């Protein structure tokens, strides 16, 4: 859980500002 974005997702994934997998 990446609290920096407030969305669930593996920290190994690059995420968009929404916290979704890039």
UniProtKB/Swiss-Prot annotation:
Segments for region (Disordered): 1-22
Known role: Inhibits chymotrypsin stoichiometrically. Also inhibits porcine pancreatic elastase and trypsin.
Keywords assigned by UniProt, alphabetized: Protease inhibitor, Secreted, Serine protease inhibitor
UniProt protein name: Chymotrypsin inhibitor
Lineage of the organism: Eukaryota, Metazoa, Ecdysozoa, Arthropoda, Hexapoda
Domain of life: Eukaryota
GO molecular function: serine-type endopeptidase inhibitor activity
Free-text tissue specificity from the UniProt record: Hemolymph.
Subcellular location: Secreted, Extracellular space
Protein's UniProt keywords contain GTP-binding: no
Principal location class: secreted
Record-level GO cellular component terms: extracellular region
Protein's UniProt keywords contain Transferase: no
């Amino acid at each position: 859980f990446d609290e920096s974005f407030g969305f669930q997702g593996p920290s190994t994934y690059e995420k968009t500002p929404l916290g979704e997998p890039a």
